[in-house]
Amino acid sequence: MASPSAYDLFRNGTRLLEDGDFHAATVPLLRARELEPGKASVREALGRALFGAQRYQEAADEFGAVVQSAPTNDYALFCLGRSLQMLGRHDEARHPLALASTLRPEREDYRRYRDRARRRADAA
């Protein structure tokens, strides 16, 4: 029997992710990343699953990798910032959240978390 392809693993992982089964979604998505480490869509989905599973440092690492390859990916910037916030690293979260809100000024949620990171970093 052939091993599943990166695409099949990605589809399985995203299906689990959409169903809210974050922990289970990490399993096929980690395998997909092993097969396709440069694929931003795989890394972004894995970051979402890790964030949902409250594995914030790993999520930040995945979103950081996406931002490295696609520095104007507003969603990856936003998720990187949110991951850093969940780790209590509000000062570090300010930059990616500010970039995300600049890239997508219509996103009220981006602005809200950007402002929250600024306030918490300034209070520290």
How would you label these PLM feature ranges?
Residues 3-35, 52:
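Alpha-helical segment of the N-proximal tetratricopeptide repeat
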Residues 19-30, 53-65, 87-99, 121-124:
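Structural signature of tandem alpha-helical TPR/SEL1-like repeats
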Residues 64-86:
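Mid-chain, well-packed structural core segment of small domains
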